[in-house]
């Protein structure tokens, strides 16, 4: 959940999307497994119910930030795209799908759906979605990409996906380029 991590991606994208505002927040909590990092919610030693409860708190915070950015910059929700890595992807999916005012897109890297039953019961919009995941990810296994794809297909979403070869828990150049092309196609 470090904003500086995703800001590296934003710096690359900014070159090709010059009229785009990038907001790269830190997640709201200090990371439970690292003194220097941040997290949207604690995944360690938590029950499924506790993870959902904590993710709902994070979702409120992200929604508040989205609404502030929209108001401050005189934007419409259709001009908003969320992008996240790992937990950032997870909270972007949950928040973006549940928003009543549909955002444009979600670019997700190495994440998963936090709680499919909860999300199934709270679908409010259908943003454009691309999910990417490394085939060698040992932090968030690639099987979660396949589960998310199945969820979205079952719920009549058109979702793009890419399994990145020989990639661990990170965003490789190929992934950043695919995310950029996806945003160019959907935002402009």
Ranges and model annotations:
Residues 130-133, 137:
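Short beta-strand/loop motif that positions the catalytic acidic residue
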Residues 6-11, 141-151:
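Short alpha-helix in the alpha/beta-hydrolase fold that links the catalytic acid
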Residues 8, 94-98:
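Active-site signature of alpha/beta-hydrolase-fold catalytic machinery across serine-
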Residues 82-84, 109, 132:
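Short beta-strand immediately N-terminal to the catalytic nucleophile in serine-hydrolase-like folds
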Residues 84-88, 92:
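Gly/Ala-rich beta-loop-alpha elbow adjacent to hydrolase catalytic centers
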Residues 146-188:
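C-terminal catalytic histidine-bearing segment of alpha/beta-hydrolase fold enzymes
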Residues 101-113:
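A conserved short beta-strand
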